[in-house]
Design a protein with these regions (language model features):
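PRY/SPRY (B30.2) beta-sandwich protein-interaction domains
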Residues: 1-200
């Protein structure tokens, strides 16, 4: 996560090499890598504050105030803890299962087809129908807390124990890269510089 590139109304506290973020009331945390092609996978452990957590993707420069009440010209897309999804263009709508502390949310971002799917504990949500489609341009990792503090840990393939919070599972992507808790979906790769050089 990019400790400099943050926005919103709430404070954000980073730790574990900027891979753990405590995102306070309407704070926005964003990743440091953006992609516009390829198929990419990463995981997020919900550590605490599950009732105010969101996991998603965003374009560079996206920011949001009260749960996607945004005047930003950039776009963001989230999977909310109550199982709904939301983008700035519309209200929240039904998508998948709710999630809680200790759950792992997987993000499968397919920029070749312009869509994103979310996984809860290795189960693809909404029977595999994409949460959002028609994505284009650069997109990257995004988190927001709302109405409280949500603490999350990001794993882009470097530590499937999530800083010792889980028992490591040592799954790799199709290139043999990464250390994931769950195996990435077929054809999706760890968001790292080696894969970016080949597939980005």
């Amino acid at each position: 996560l990019n400790h400099i590139d943050k926005a919103g109304n709430g404070a954000i506290t980073f730790s574990e090499g900027n891979l753990k973020a405590a995102v306070e009331d309407n704070g926005n945390a964003r990743g440091s890598i953006y992609v516009n092609s390829g198929k990419w996978y990463w995981e997020t452990l919900i550590v605490s504050g599950d009732s105010v957590a969101t996991v998603g993707i965003a374009e560079p420069g996206f920011y949001s105030g009260n749960l996607f009440d945004s005047s930003s010209t950039a776009k963001g897309y989230i999977y909310i803890n109550n199982g709904q999804k939301r983008s700035p263009a519309g209200s929240a709508s039904s998508y998948g299962s709710s999630y809680a502390n200790d759950d792992i949310i997987g993000v499968a971002l397919n920029m070749d087809d312009g869509e994103v799917k979310f996984y809860k504990n290795n189960t693809v949500q909404n029977s595999g129908t994409a949460a959002f489609t028609s994505l284009s341009g650069d997109h990257g990792i995004y988190y927001q807390g709302y109405g409280g503090t949500a603490t999350v840990i990001l794993n882009t393939g470097h530590d499937s124990s999530f800083a010792g919070n889980k028992t490591a599972q040592n799954n790799t992507d199709g290139n043999g890269y990464g250390d994931f808790y769950y195996s990435p979906p077929s054809g999706f790769f760890a968001l790292n510089t080696k894969n970016l050089a080949e597939y980005g």
